[in-house]
């Protein structure tokens, strides 16, 4: 389920010029606004270069009736730290803190690189250890979306108590939450 090269049509010659967020789902493939919320916080609070994937995620705040919800979500979580995206790691990490000082480390990016840092998986509101069966389930859901021409990224989290800096060592034993799937539709004339 990993991708080494993502080709995007920046000129709009072959595609409709914008990547759209098609699905936000848990590890079983069910729609999950919780996965979208954590991806939104990661996209909003990282300071890296603006990119089409983050733009598609951030556009969720313009969905009908969702603007006030995302305003409240941003008020609930404040950015504390980040480790920017780089092409070796293939994901971005942000640490957000709630009013009580407890934090959530959120990573978002390449499926293989994110899953490699996960020791747990979130299944139906339960946190379970990642094992071979769960890895096969993850691969099955992701492979189906990739075969449909989607770009798929993973979202994972980990609760961090009262810490205001994150280090690469913190990006272990993460909890895989789910996926985001994007589509850049080809033009009918392409």
Regions found by a protein language model. Name each.
Residues 1-190:
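Conserved cytosolic headpiece of P-type ATPases
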């Amino acid at each position: 389920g990993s991708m080494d090269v993502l080709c995007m049509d920046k000129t709009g010659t072959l595609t409709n010029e914008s990547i759209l967020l098609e699905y936000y789902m848990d590890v079983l493939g069910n729609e999950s606004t919780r996965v979208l919320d954590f991806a939104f916080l990661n996209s909003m609070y990282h300071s890296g270069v603006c990119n089409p994937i983050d733009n598609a995620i951030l556009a969720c705040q313009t969905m009908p009736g969702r603007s006030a919800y995302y305003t409240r979500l941003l008020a609930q979580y404040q950015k504390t730290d980040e480790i920017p995206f780089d092409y070796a790691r293939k994901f971005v990490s942000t640490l957000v803190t709630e009013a009580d000082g407890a934090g959530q480390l959120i990573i978002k990016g390449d499926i293989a690189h994110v899953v490699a840092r996960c020791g747990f998986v979130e299944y139906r509101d339960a946190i379970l250890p990642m094992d071979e069966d769960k890895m096969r389930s993850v691969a099955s859901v992701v492979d189906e979306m990739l075969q449909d021409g989607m770009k798929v990224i993973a979202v994972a989290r980990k609760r961090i108590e009262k810490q205001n800096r994150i280090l690469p060592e913190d990006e272990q034993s993460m909890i895989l939450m789910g996926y985001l799937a994007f589509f850049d539709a080809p033009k009918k004339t392409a």
